[in-house]
Amino acid sequence: MNYDETNNELFQESNMQELKYGERNILEGELITFPNPRIGRRYEINISLPEFTCKCPFSGYPDFATIHIKYIPNERVVELKAIKLYINSYRERYISHEESVNQILDDFVAACDPLEVKIKGDFLPRGNVHTTIEVEHYKAS
């Protein structure tokens, strides 16, 4: 390992130590799942996350939304604290409304492979414009 690599690792390590525990949890956050306790039973799970924030990739202004997730689980169910931390990881990202909701769908499907999922991002009005983005995924039969 050369001098620059060593300094970079030490810098990253010291920055991680300076972070508050919640910030570390968000940075390390990933969508964690557990086995569906009722495989074979078709039931719906609804999750509402009212504190979604990201930054506009054009202006840098914050955007605020409620993310609604409605899904029918397959073999895995998403763990609620993990999805909260995952959603919080968007807070400092420069990302459009459209891309954020589509990325959440992609990551959700990759993590728990639901039979069906619908994700809705209901963004607070900005500049007198109210945006709602809805995306869906259906598992191929």
UniProtKB/Swiss-Prot annotation:
One of its GO terms (molecular function) is preQ1 synthase activity. GO terms for cellular component: cytoplasm. Pathway: tRNA modification; tRNA-queuosine biosynthesis. The active site is at 56 (thioimide intermediate), 63 (proton donor). Substrate binds at residues 78-80, 97-98. One of its GO terms (biological process) is queuosine biosynthetic process. Its EC number is 1.7.1.13. It catalyses: 7-aminomethyl-7-carbaguanine + 2 NADP(+) = 7-cyano-7-deazaguanine + 2 NADPH + 3 H(+). SUPFAM superfamilies: Tetrahydrobiopterin biosynthesis enzymes-like. Keywords: Cytoplasm, NADP, Oxidoreductase, Queuosine biosynthesis. It is found in: Cytoplasm. It is an enzyme of class 1 (oxidoreductase). Belongs to the GTP cyclohydrolase I family. QueF type 1 subfamily. Catalyzes the NADPH-dependent reduction of 7-cyano-7-deazaguanine (preQ0) to 7-aminomethyl-7-deazaguanine (preQ1). This is NADPH-dependent 7-cyano-7-deazaguanine reductase.
